[in-house]
Design a protein with these regions (language model features):
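Immediate post-signal-peptide N-terminus of mature secreted/exported proteins
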Residues: 22-74, 143-147, 173
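Long, amphipathic, charge-rich alpha-helical segments that form helical bundles/coiled-coils
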Residues: 77-136, 143-146
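Heptad-repeat coiled-coil alpha-helices
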Residues: 52-55, 59-63, 122, 126-129, ...
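Extended amphipathic alpha-helical interaction segments
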Residues: 120, 143-173
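Bacterial signal peptide processing site
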Residues: 18-20
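Bacterial N-terminal signal peptides that target proteins for export
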Residues: 1-3
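C-terminal motif of bacterial Sec signal peptides marking the signal peptidase cleavage site
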Residues: 13-16
């Protein structure tokens, strides 16, 4: 029995060491490095666009003003924040560093975000014109719509981050 136990004890270290050389580093090609660089560049451009495009402070100021039916101190001119057209073109056309499904999801979410943002600020302008006409009923309807649009904008932003996060984490490795 002692010989059997001794043989088993000797066999385990040999079996566990014979699995091959685990010190080899994974082979990374130039294409992988270029792809990772494209992902990081796209992500950084996205961060800039998202930060500049939908400023939570401005959205909340518009909603607060609308909530008070224009009785709050007049807002300084609120205009949609400017976004560099080159950057918006980049985020709407993600490169081949992403698979087709991811590219489609990014395009859909950015398109939805751009549309919601445009409608949000257009509604605010219309809201102000309704207030001048003392048309409180239609103004109230726009407040409800803008609350929905602000929620949509937040959801689109979160979706974009959720889509990009796994790719950027992988690219940073």
């Amino acid at each position: 029995n002692l010989l059997l136990v001794g043989a088993l004890v000797s066999a385990f270290p040999l079996a566990s060491c014979s699995g091959g050389d685990k010190s080899k580093a994974p082979v990374v090609s130039t294409a992988d490095i270029e792809n990772a660089a494209e992902v990081i560049k796209y992500y950084n451009t996205s961060l800039g666009v998202l930060k500049d495009m939908v400023k939570e402070k401005d959205v909340n100021a518009v909603l607060d003003y609308m909530e008070q039916k224009g009785k709050a101190p007049a807002l300084s001119a609120i205009v949609p924040p400017a976004v560099v057209s080159k950057d918006s073109a980049i985020v709407l056309n993600p490169g081949n560093c992403f698979n087709e499904e991811t590219r489609q999801n990014l395009k859909q979410n950015y398109t939805g975000l751009f549309q919601a943002r445009t409608e949000f600020y257009a509604n605010f302008d219309t809201y102000l014109s309704y207030l001048k006409k003392k048309d409180v009923t239609n103004a109230k309807k726009l407040l409800d719509v803008n609350y929905q649009l602000s929620t949509q904008m937040s959801e689109y932003k979160q979706n974009i981050f959720d889509i990009l996060s796994p790719f950027t984490e992988q690219a940073e490795l």
